[in-house]
């Protein structure tokens, strides 16, 4: 499996139950580094070839640019930016910032980073779930999400979006906590 023998990756395994997934999310809430959650329902990933990155209107979404660019550069994976289908321009602006980052890193390092922008069918509130639902269509090996900043009433009653994605996903899910002091990936 791709994650074995890698000291840089925080890997959490749990069963697919809501309680088990929520326990992992609560346990990892303060981490400054990205972490990967794997359940028994997920297929084994031997190589990263395609990474789905759902992009919503939230300003924290751009934190994922550095992570997906790093992974793509190191593994040669193709990045799929799944842009939320919103009426406003915020998701489009976030995708633009992510593309700018991808191009800048590609130019600076002299590597070719492959990416594409796909318009989601759902809006910002449901784009993460759409990524989980369409992972087979995209032949994805990883879903990259930003964790919830604060849990609102809906999250407390029904569970945060990332929990639902992890429960539905058939591939590992990498989460990034939205923190100003987010750990920076370096070579």
Model features per residue range: what roles?
Residues 1-26, 30, 109-143, 148-153, ...:
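Structural beta-alpha unit
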Residues 15-16, 59, 85-90, 120-122:
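Short histidine/acidic/glycine/proline-rich micro-motifs that form metal-
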Residues 3, 8-69, 73-74, 80-82, ...:
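Intrinsically disordered or low-complexity boundary/linker segments at protein termini
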Residues 53-54, 86-88, 116-117, 147-148:
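A short, structure-level motif marking secondary-structure boundaries and short turns
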Residues 31-34, 93-98, 125-129:
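Short acidic/polar alpha-helix capping motifs at helix-coil junctions
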Residues 59-62, 96, 121-125, 156:
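Conserved phosphate-coordination/catalytic loops
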Residues 53-55, 97-100, 162-163:
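Short, hinge-like loop/turn segments at secondary-structure boundaries
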Residues 61-111:
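Redox- and metal-dependent alpha/beta enzyme cores, enriched for Fe-S-associated oxidoreductases
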């Amino acid at each position: 499996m791709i994650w074995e023998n890698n000291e840089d990756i925080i890997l959490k395994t749990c069963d697919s139950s809501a309680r088990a997934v929520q326990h992992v999310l609560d346990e990892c809430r303060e981490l400054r580094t990205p972490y990967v959650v794997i359940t028994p329902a997920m297929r084994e990933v031997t190589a990263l070839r395609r990474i789905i990155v759902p992009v919503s209107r939230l300003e924290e979404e751009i934190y994922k640019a550095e992570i997906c660019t790093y992974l793509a550069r190191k593994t040669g994976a193709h990045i799929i930016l799944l842009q939320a289908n919103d009426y406003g321009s915020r998701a489009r602006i976030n995708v633009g910032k992510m593309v700018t980052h991808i191009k800048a890193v590609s130019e600076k390092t002299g590597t070719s980073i492959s990416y594409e922008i796909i318009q989601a069918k759902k809006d910002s509130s449901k784009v993460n779930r759409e990524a989980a639902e369409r992972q087979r269509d995209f032949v994805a090996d990883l879903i990259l999400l930003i964790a919830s900043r604060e849990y609102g009433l809906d999250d407390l009653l029904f569970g945060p979006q990332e929990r639902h994605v992890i429960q539905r996903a058939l591939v590992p899910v990498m989460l990034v906590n939205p923190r100003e002091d987010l750990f920076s990936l370096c070579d």
